[in-house]
Each structure stands twice: as C-alpha cells, then as structure tokens.
C-alpha cells in the first residue's frame, strides 16, 4: 500500500513543467507583444506607431515605505511567496532590449544613437524630428521606455513599468479568464 502511494505521489505532470527559476527575455517579449498590442482594453500605449526605446536608461526605483521594503511591496503585489524568485528578477535587471518587438510591428528606436549626439534635455526635439520623418507628427516628442517586466511564478501577475522622458507609470497586470487586466500601482515624475 505504501509503495503505491509513493509511486502515485512521485508521478510528474510533464505538460506543466516550467523553469520557475528563470523568466527568459523571449518570454518577456511575448508578454509585451500581447499586452502592448491591446490598444482597446488595456491601452498601455496609444498605438504600435509610438516610438519605443530599445533600452530604458532609467533605473527601476520603487518607493520604499518606512519599515516596508521594495521587495515586500513586490511580494505582496505579485502575491508571490517565493521571495528568491522575485528578488532574482530585480537583482539581475539590466538594460532590457526591446529590439525584438520590431518583429511584431512596433517602432523600436536605438536611443544610443540619440544619446551620443545630444544632451539628455534635447532628446524630445530629436524624437519629434523622428516622429515627423516616420509620418507620425501627432506623437510630437512622445516615446516610451519599458523596464523588464517582473513576473510571479504562475505568470498570472506581472509588474510593468512604462517610462516617458520625465515620468513613468507602474502597472500590475493580472490575467483573469485568459485576459489581462491592469491596475495602476505607482507613478513618478521629474
């Protein structure tokens, strides 16, 4: 009887194996394509025609509350008990390359080119020129930068930061009934 119990409890469901210790760049790109393409319900961006920087040069910086760490805030938001899983995503944040989003019709621009030519405060003028030359004058000097999304292990809650030149918004995206829902959980402004 005991042998049968051990055998049954050790049986794996191979169809559900996910490497929980790693959120790949490809997984992030697929997620971003899905949520950014939804310009009807989520409306994270106005259109695929808005310029997206290939790299966010702002640092991830959550607000720390007294006696409440950034990590505690994230664990609670993501409803994640595996603190190492979340902490590893934060600790390994680097300049997340969004270049592959170009394959899905997004306007990705190499901001290193702009930063090498002009001062930080002159970036909006350069972006306006690019938007005009791309046939998108309605966007003026608008562009966005995306931080690498931070997932919970189930991949049904994600913290996504969308940065603009002098401001940014943090969204908690939750997957319910195969659809993503957004909730604004933070913002910053210079």
Listing of model-derived features with the role each one plays in the protein:
Residues 151-177:
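Exposed beta-sheet edge and beta->alpha loop/turn motif
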Residues 6-9:
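C-terminal motif of bacterial Sec signal peptides marking the signal peptidase cleavage site
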Residues 11-157:
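Flexible low-complexity loop/turn motifs enriched in small/helix-breaking residues
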């Amino acid at each position: 009887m005991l042998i049968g119990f051990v055998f049954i409890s050790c049986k794996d469901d191979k169809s559900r194996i996910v490497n929980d210790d790693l959120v790949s760049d490809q997984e992030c790109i697929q997620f971003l394509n899905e949520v950014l393409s939804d310009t009807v319900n989520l409306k994270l961006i106005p259109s695929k025609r808005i310029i997206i920087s290939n790299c966010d040069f702002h640092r991830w910086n959550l607000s720390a509350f007294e006696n409440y760490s950034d990590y505690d805030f994230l664990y609670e938001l993501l409803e994640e008990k595996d603190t190492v899983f979340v902490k590893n995503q934060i600790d390994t944040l680097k300049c997340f390359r969004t270049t592959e989003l170009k394959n899905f019709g997004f306007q990705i621009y190499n901001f290193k080119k702009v930063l090498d030519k002009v001062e930080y405060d002159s970036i909006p003028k350069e972006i306006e020129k690019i938007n005009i030359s791309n046939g998108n004058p309605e966007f003026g000097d608008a562009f966005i930068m995306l931080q690498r999304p931070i997932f919970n292990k189930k991949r049904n809650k994600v913290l996504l930061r969308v940065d603009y030149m002098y401001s940014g918004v943090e969204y908690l995206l939750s997957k319910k009934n195969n659809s993503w829902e957004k909730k604004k959980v933070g913002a910053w402004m210079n």
